[in-house]
């Protein structure tokens, strides 16, 4: 090939690559999914996917119910017994707002009653419980220690409940773990036997599950860290930033900041689908959600955008390539089928 032609081909290829990289993200559509009692709004917060039940868990706040949704059929089942209240016009300070799965049971908080409840999903009822020492935020089951950890940000710490070996398990207060300056969010890393939580400003802490103490503090690249999502096999921790967007920490290399992405404003609870390697980043103040591809090296690239709703600050991924997004003001969920590569 002659030199001028080689130069022309190289320039053409470079232009093509630049044009490809500059392509705008695809736009996906969200479908509304009404919740019972949603008229007037529901203070939704912590949505989770229970792999054992293969259901999306929706603690439906002031309605006094925990909603379980089959992502395949989209059938909804309600479990009552939590405190009910009238629409509060914003916030998520009433009823049940966080839940986790463990030992075949569900462990849910009740902000109004200040209780940790044990729910039998087969019977559809609350079967045990214990009083909380403070206002709760997140509940997480810790299989390695047979405990439930409940964050209490107003007390700057985590209340730890030991579970009996009985069936159903009965929770008993066991300890209080101080997390000064936090905790916000909570994820359990079973492989590393660690828990991760954010501080309200710029940092994430690593907690030894057995020792029940903070062992490391990492800068996470956010001004206001909020939600966390764990890629356990990929050894990555994603952090949602209140200023808008997310960052990724490389857990295999000292939790170094691997990459960051800015999107909108008012990001809170992010979600991750490890099969697709997609991160979901809601922007509550713009009423949108970014779909972000995570490369094998941990680099973040926005590949999609979803129009959601103002105030939609939380998301969870299921095992059907769907994302469920909370719409607190609408008292409903929004569902997106992720068809992106």
Where are the model-predicted features located?
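Sec-dependent signal peptide recognition
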Residues: 2-10, 18
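Predominantly soluble domains enriched in secretory-pathway, periplasmic, or organellar proteins
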Residues: 20-341
């Amino acid at each position: 090939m002659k030199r001028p032609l080689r130069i022309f081909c190289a320039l053409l290829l470079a232009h093509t690559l630049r044009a490809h990289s500059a392509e705008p993200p695809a736009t996906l559509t969200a479908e509304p999914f009404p919740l019972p009692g949603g008229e007037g709004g529901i203070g939704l917060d912590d949505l989770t996917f229970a792999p054992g039940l293969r259901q999306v868990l929706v603690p439906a706040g002031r309605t006094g119910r925990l909603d379980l949704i089959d992502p395949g059929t989209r059938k909804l089942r309600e479990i009552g017994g939590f405190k009910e209240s009238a629409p509060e016009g914003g916030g998520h300070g009433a009823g049940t707002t966080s839940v986790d799965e463990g030992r075949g049971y569900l462990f849910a908080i009740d902000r109004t009653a200040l209780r940790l409840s044990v729910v039998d999903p087969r019977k559809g009822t609350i079967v045990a419980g214990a009083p909380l020492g403070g206002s709760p935020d997140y509940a997480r089951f810790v299989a390695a220690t047979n405990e439930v950890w409940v964050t209490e940000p107003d007390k700057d710490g985590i209340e730890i409940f030991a579970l009996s070996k009985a069936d159903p398990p009965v929770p008993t207060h066991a300890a209080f773990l101080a997390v000064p300056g936090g905790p916000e969010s909570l994820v359990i890393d079973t492989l590393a036997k660690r828990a991760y939580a954010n501080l309200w400003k710029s940092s994430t802490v690593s907690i030894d599950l057995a020792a029940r103490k903070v062992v490391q503090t990492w800068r996470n690249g956010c001004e206001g860290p909020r939600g966390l999502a764990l890629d356990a096999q990929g050894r990555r921790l994603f952090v949602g930033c209140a200023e808008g967007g997310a960052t990724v920490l490389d857990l295999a290399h000292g939790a170094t900041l691997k990459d960051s992405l800015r999107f909108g404003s008012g990001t809170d609870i992010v979600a991750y689908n490890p099969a697709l390697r997609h991160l979901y980043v809601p922007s509550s103040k713009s009423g949108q959600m970014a779909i972000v591809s995570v490369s094998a090296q941990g680099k973040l690239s926005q590949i999609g955008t979803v129009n959601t709703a103002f105030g939609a600050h939380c998301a969870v991924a299921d095992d059907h390539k769907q994302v469920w997004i909370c719409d607190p003001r609408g008292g409903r969920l929004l569902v997106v089928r992720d068809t992106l590569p």
